[in-house]
Structure formats: C-alpha cells, structure tokens
C-alpha cells in the first residue's frame, strides 16, 4: 500500500529514533526502502540490524556517495506501491501520522498528497518523553504547512506568499510524484512540490503529527555563508556558487510556465536573486 523511502548518510545519531517512530505507526501495511549513501559512521550497521529484524525493511548500501538528490530519486524509483512518502533520517512522527493521512487520501481522490502540521525541533529527541504526543495541537495553526487547494495558479501564488515549503515529507500518490525527476540544486524541493500540485490539491491534517529536525547543515544559520554552503555542501562549481538561486529560478519557470511566472513570481525571484548575491558577496569578502 505504502512505500517509505529513507535516504540516509552518516545518520548514526538519529536513524534509530527515525526507524522506531515509523515502526511504531498504527498503520502497518508498508515497506521501508532504506538507502545508505555510503556512510562512513555506524549508519550501515544500524540499518542492517533493523533490516534483519523486520522483513518490511529493504536495505541498500550504495557503493559510493552520490548526491542527495540521487539518493532521494533512488528510493522513489524502487517503489511499486500506490502511495509513497520520503522520511528524513532525523525526523519523528506521531504514531497515527500514516493512518490518518492515508485515510484522507483514500476518500479524497482529487488530492495528490496529505501531511500534518509540523513542529520544528533542534535538540536531541528523547524517545522516552511522550509528552509531545499527548498534546498535538500546534502553537500556531498551519505555522509551517498550509492546505494547498484551488487552481494550479492559485496554489502557486499562495505557496510563494506563504514562503514555507515543509511539504516534502507528505504522503503522495506515487504515480504523480514520479512525473518529476529531482535535480541536484539548492531548494530542489520547491519545483518538486509545484509539479505535484499540477495534478491535484494537498491536504494538511489538523494537529502536529510530524516533528522536523532543524539543526543540520541546511539550517537557516548555515545559509548566512551562502557561497561556502553551495560549494561545500551542494557541490556547486565556483561559478555556479556566485549565482546560487539561478537553478531554482530556471526550474520553477519550467514547472509553472511563463504566464504564471511572469504574472506572480518574476518580481519575487528578481529580489531573491538580488538578496542571494548580497549574501554571496558578504561571504566572500568576510573570509
């Protein structure tokens, strides 16, 4: 029924909590496609141990470290299920996350995906502390995700006004998700979500049922050194790192089309590229 793709690289600190969170779901008819991107820490042995214990886990260790996008594409390509979700190796889910979102999708064929409200955390998650699950009401309704409903143009306009893109880890209908091939560039999840929205709406279940870790290399503070980030983390060439938002601009233009882009997004992307160039220059001259 559902494939859960977990791309992981050097995730020894979090992968056990992630897998426990998924294996403790009230819905159990799923497979886990666990792809280790040639980790150099204990990730491989941890993943193999879990795969040996649970036949629902398909564990693959890549021979060499590929790009983040290639690992995300890989786990999606392995899926033969009707529904698919990516699971970040450092995130946590409420036990009813899958059940409630699948129930919605089963009864609403015009929706291409469903997720829940999201709460961000930056510390180490204590598995024995279940207090976060006892009160799953958000601090602010739709703080990080918001239902995306309407025409494609309306959804695009709202999404860029909302300016938050925590939809990547929703449960999607696999056939629509596979219509877009992920390319490796900063914020590649934006055109991915836009492309999926061509085929229907995206639901957000009430209450926080996903807890997303924000203390990694792609945290907001890390983007203050934009030139360094794009070179060292994303693998951009020196020239590409000078213009880090150009790939995103190009891919969004291709997905939404010239009419919607010129009408709703042109000014925004001009400003975003301008701000990016300022950050790049500040990073370069602060060295």
Give the predicted meaning of each segment.
Residues 84:
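Short aromatic/hydrophobic "clamp" motif used to bind/position activated sugar donors
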Residues 96-138:
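Conserved donor NDP-sugar-binding/catalytic core segment of glycosyltransferases
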Residues 140-226:
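Conserved nucleotide-sugar donor-binding catalytic segment
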Residues 16, 41-49, 96:
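Acidic helix N-cap motif at the loop->helix transition within catalytic regions
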Residues 1-2, 23-34, 42, 55-58:
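Short loop->beta transition adjacent to catalytic acidic/histidine clusters or analogous donor-positioning motifs
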Residues 36-45, 64-65, 88:
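A conserved acidic beta->alpha catalytic loop
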Residues 62-79:
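Glycine-rich, basic loop-to-helix element that forms the pyrophosphate-binding segment
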């Amino acid at each position: 029924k559902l494939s859960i793709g977990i791309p992981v690289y050097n995730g020894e600190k979090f992968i056990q909590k992630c897998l426990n969170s998924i294996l403790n779901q009230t819905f159990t008819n799923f497979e886990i496609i666990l792809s280790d991107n040639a980790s150099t820490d204990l990730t491989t042995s941890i993943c193999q141990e879990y795969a040996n214990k649970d036949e629902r886990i398909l564990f693959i260790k890549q021979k060499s470290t590929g790009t983040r996008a290639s690992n995300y594409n890989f786990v999606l390509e392995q899926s033969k299920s009707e529904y698919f979700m990516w699971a970040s190796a450092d995130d946590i889910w409420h036990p009813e996350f899958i059940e409630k979102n699948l129930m919605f999708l089963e009864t609403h064929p015009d929706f291409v995906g469903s997720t829940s409200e999201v709460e961000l955390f930056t510390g180490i998650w204590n598995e024995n502390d279940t207090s976060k699950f006892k009160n799953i009401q958000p601090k602010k309704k739709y703080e990080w995700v918001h239902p995306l409903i309407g025409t494609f143009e309306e959804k695009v306009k709202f999404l860029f006004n909302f300016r938050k893109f925590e939809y990547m880890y929703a449960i999607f209908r696999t056939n629509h998700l596979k219509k877009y091939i992920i390319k490796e560039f900063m914020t590649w999840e934006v055109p991915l979500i836009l492309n999926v929205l061509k085929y229907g709406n995206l639901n957000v279940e009430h209450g926080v049922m996903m807890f997303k870790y924000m203390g990694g290399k792609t945290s907001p503070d890390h983007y203050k050194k934009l030139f360094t980030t794009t070179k060292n983390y994303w693998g951009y060439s020196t020239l590409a790192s000078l213009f880090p938002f150009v790939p995103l601009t190009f891919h969004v233009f291709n997905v939404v089309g010239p009419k919607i882009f010129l009408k709703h997004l042109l000014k925004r992307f001009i400003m975003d590229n301008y701000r990016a160039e300022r950050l790049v220059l500040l990073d370069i001259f602060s060295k």
